[in-house]
Amino acid sequence: MSTEKTNQSWGGRFSEPVDAFVARFTASVDFDKRLYRHDIMGSIAHATMLAQVGVLSDAERDTIIDGLKTIQGEIEAGNFDWRVDLEDVHMNIEARLTDRIGITGKKLHTGRSRNDQVATDIRLWLRDEIDLILGEITRLQQGLLEQAEREAETIMPGFTHLQTAQPVTFGHHLLAWFEMLSRDYERLVDCRKRTNRMPLGSAALAGTTYPIDRELTCKLLGFEAVAGNSLDGVSDRDFAIEFCAAASVAMMHLSRFSEELVLWTSAQFQFIDLPDRFCTGSSIMPQKKNPDVPELVRGKSGRVFGALTGLLTLMKGQPLAYNKDNQEDKEPLFDAADTLRDSLRAFADMIPAIKPKHAIMREAALRGFSTATDLADYLVRRGLPFRDCHEIVGHAVKYGVDTGKDLAEMSLDELRQFSDQIEQDVFAVLTLEGSVNARDHIGGTAPAQVRAAVVRGKALLASR
């Protein structure tokens, strides 16, 4: 055990001061100090309420609020001395307040515990973070809409199993990511509703004997409602878990998008070019231009998945109410929010700058018999059962593989080997343009539908 000792503000019950190493081990100020603004916001609302119900005088309230605002200025100017021996952001600010204004500072904590204080701080912080993240999602979606509108007629191969499947437009492909991000946006908006509940007033676990006005504090802090049960108020971290779950889904989407960008920029695909400002080089290979931004986003998804798993594991064995375990909720939550926000920002900056290589995309779509399904549909319209058509086209594809010809490159006589229902008009069906234009329905890849989807997307963003 360390022989160095330190004293805590709650030491009245103890016969010896806490061991210095234990003090450092249990302190959270190194990471929870980022809650300072929300801690001060909550304290100002709490002081205002205490004055309203007569626990503080108006003069005491004003002195406390002025002191808290001064402390916020000190922190933001980098002039605040964060002390590990004071454990956390709450006690550091309270101690500094008492240093500045004297005994009145000690009255601020009346009717409040650090248990409901920290639960309130985290909710205030996460509410703001969600708003920032929603803004980045919208910015990324705007970039996708702009690209999709420009590339409504650009044809590329669509894939299943990473094998050529059917022709699609690049605009249509980009709008798939728009749809995923719309769901991410909705999940986070929904999560924000449950985050925006105020635990302040729950005190340690059972509430307080003081005549507090929780509705007033709730209104001052912009919460939608108060937590309905004091035990749950200080114990609940569902909102943090729910956020990390929504963030995990969003990062999974960005990771899949990243994988496609990495593939598309490779020499083997060459579908797109990323501007140099989003890439790095190699220390040994002079020719390299590495897509580091999407690669890092793909890798960082694991951090957010880990945060979700960590929080679930953290909470699963805890009895009510607050336990010291919950100190470990902040770092994974902070990291998940930072990672998602930064990843979205990188993508929102990068996506509008992507340069598709139209000729290469088109050439790739011409390989792999991408219009085979169109030929089968053509035969269905001639009255044949689809399963028979499927087999007929399969034989035609095998012939194409053996002869090195795509379906559109075969002569009419060659095609008629497989069905006498095939006529000259089949070649309009077998073109890339014919294929994509034929899928002219809501959600289809036809250029007209891409443009219509862009209009709907713009209306959605404008409604937020």
Swiss-Prot record:
Q: What is its EC number?
A: 4.3.2.1
One BP annotation, GO: L-arginine biosynthetic process
Q: Name one GO molecular function term.
A: argininosuccinate lyase activity
Choose one Gene Ontology CC annotation of this protein and give it.
cytosol
Chemical reaction(s) catalysed: 2-(N(omega)-L-arginino)succinate = fumarate + L-arginine
Q: In which pathway does it act?
A: Amino-acid biosynthesis; L-arginine biosynthesis; L-arginine from L-ornithine and carbamoyl phosphate: step 3/3
Instruction: Quote the PANTHER family the UniProt record gives.
Output: ARGININOSUCCINATE LYASE
Q: Which family does it belong to?
A: Belongs to the lyase 1 family. Argininosuccinate lyase subfamily.
- NCBIfam families, per this entry? argH (TIGR00838)
Name it.
Answer: Argininosuccinate lyase
Which organism is this entry from?
Pseudomonas putida (strain ATCC 47054 / DSM 6125 / CFBP 8728 / NCIMB 11950 / KT2440)
Q: Provide the gene name from the record.
A: argH
